[in-house]
Structure formats: C-alpha cells, structure tokens
Amino acid sequence: MPERSDPLTRSLIALIRGYQVGISPWLPPACRYYPTCSQYTLEAVRRYGALRGGWLGIRRLCRCHPWHPGGYDPVPDLPGSAPTQKPFR
C-alpha cells in the first residue's frame, strides 16, 4: 500500500519520528507490545493516514499499561482487504 502524503500525515509522521529519535532513546524501555507503540502508530499513520492511523495509535496507547499482558499486536488490515476463501463444496 502506498504511503499517504497529505500535509497532516507527513507532519504526524515527522512528530513520531522525532519522538523515536530524540526522546525515546533517553527513556527506559516500557512498551509491553511488539511492535512498540510508537512504531505501531507510525505504521498505522503511514497505512491509513493521520486521522484513522492516529486513532489506532491512541487506542493502542490506552491499552499499554501494567495490567495488560501486551505481546504481538500488528496494525490491523482494512476489513475486506484480506484474501477471501472460497466456500467448501
């Protein structure tokens, strides 16, 4: 899927990358998920744009707390974008 290129999306990507490069290295590792919350949000914004991708990132950040087990949590695909299986006959 091609990367979104509207100004809001590019700005949000720049902010996330700024956090990843300038702030995150100075903090202890705390994310319970793979990919990390910032990488997840970056991928979601690149895939779905600033609004939907940003919303997915906010939802992910709300789930990242000590009482949640975490684990592998990839950015979801759009409904209907997964290959469909033919019905069994």
UniProtKB/Swiss-Prot annotation:
Keyword flag Cell inner membrane: yes
Positions of transmembrane segments: none
Annotated Gene Ontology cellular component terms: plasma membrane
Spans annotated as Disordered: 69-89
Compartments, record wording: Cell inner membrane
Mode of membrane association: Peripheral membrane protein
Keywords of the record: Cell inner membrane, Cell membrane, Membrane
UniProt function note: Could be involved in insertion of integral membrane proteins into the membrane.
Protein name: Putative membrane protein insertion efficiency factor
Source species: Synechococcus sp. (strain JA-2-3B'a(2-13)) (Cyanobacteria bacterium Yellowstone B-Prime)
